[in-house]
Structure formats: C-alpha cells, structure tokens
Amino acid sequence: MNIDLLRELEGEVLNFYQKKKMMGVSFLTGVLGVLIDLKPAALLINDKLNESKLLDNKRIMEILNKLGVDLVRERLNKFSNEEIEYLYLAKTARVCLELQKWHREFFNSVSESGEILDKKVWSEANYQIGKILGYPETATLEYIRMQIEGIEKDNNYRSRMERNYYYMHSARYENEEFEAYDLRLNLAVNEYLPVTAEIMQANTKKDG
C-alpha cells in the first residue's frame, strides 16, 4: 500500500468537497475498501459541486491508476431530472463491468419513481450488487426482504442506521457483520486516512 499516494488522494478529494466532507469520506472509504481487498468493487458517484466534477481533477485519476484500480463510468438519470455519473471501481475492469451490469439490472427493475416492477430481477440485482460491494450476505438478504415485504422501518431499524455508517445491518447479525466488514474498514481508515478518520469521528459525536 502506497501511503503517500493515499494521503495525497485524501487531500485532493476532501479539498474538492470543502464543507461537504462527509461526501468525500464515502468516496475515500470506498476506494480504501477495494485496496485492502475487503470489497471486490465500490459503487461511487462523480459528484458535481460549483459547476465542476470530482474527476475533473486529473490528479485524482492519476493517483487511482497508480494505486492499481480501474474505473468504469456511466451516466444515468432515472430518478431525477439531474444526470448522475456513477463510478464502478475495482482492481480489474472485469469486476467493474460486472458491477455495472447488475446496477443496470437494478435500474431496469424499478420505475421512474423507484417502485419495484419485477421483484425477482430486483432481488437478484440487489443480491449481486451487495456481494460485489463486499457487504455481509445476512445484511443484504435482510435489506431485500424488508423492501419486498414492505416491512415498516421501526425505531430498531433507525437505530441501526445511525450506528452503522457503511450499509444497512441486519437486526440479528449486526455484531457479526460489524466485525466482518465495518471493523476492518475502520481500522484501515485509522491507519491510512487519518484526516478521514477524524471527520468520521467528529460526525459521529455530532449525531450523538
């Protein structure tokens, strides 16, 4: 792991987001998760702020290339009038394209308003996306079940959302999922991205 390059990436990304640094945290933790082999791939967004996009900064692309990750882009605007450029990031182009394929399947399985049109296709797409993003299977399966069955989001659900930053944990296996994914990524953030770690800790204290 090239720590100097990672620290430079951290600086470039957080500088772009300025006061919206938690958006930069999402990008950086996604990249780091791929680099430490926790996630086969990351699904990110080429955000636009003040009329410029994150990857307009060519140095960010140079650093990502030097770190050994590949990137596939796709512009979609299904759920809003504003076009979003999605980034599929992995160590190989094959995995990037696999994530892109299932993300397209997901988009094709829902209406413009987000209503599920084909439950079977939607469920399989979400399962495969969760797998490629490295999320614990128990968490992905519970998310799918809640959406398909229309289970009401109670206080327990909201508490888990507040406690867990990266994805929606299941009620039964929350601790196991945290140890398998969150803890490993948190430790890597503390080691390689110190400014990002400080931002995450400050945000947690603010929410608390």
Language model features with spans:
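A conserved ligand/cofactor-binding region detector
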Residues: 1-117, 128, 135-208
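Internal, hydrophobic cores of structured domains that mediate oligomerization or house catalytic pockets
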Residues: 118-122
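An amphipathic, hydrophobic-aromatic interaction surface with interspersed Lys/Arg
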Residues: 123-130
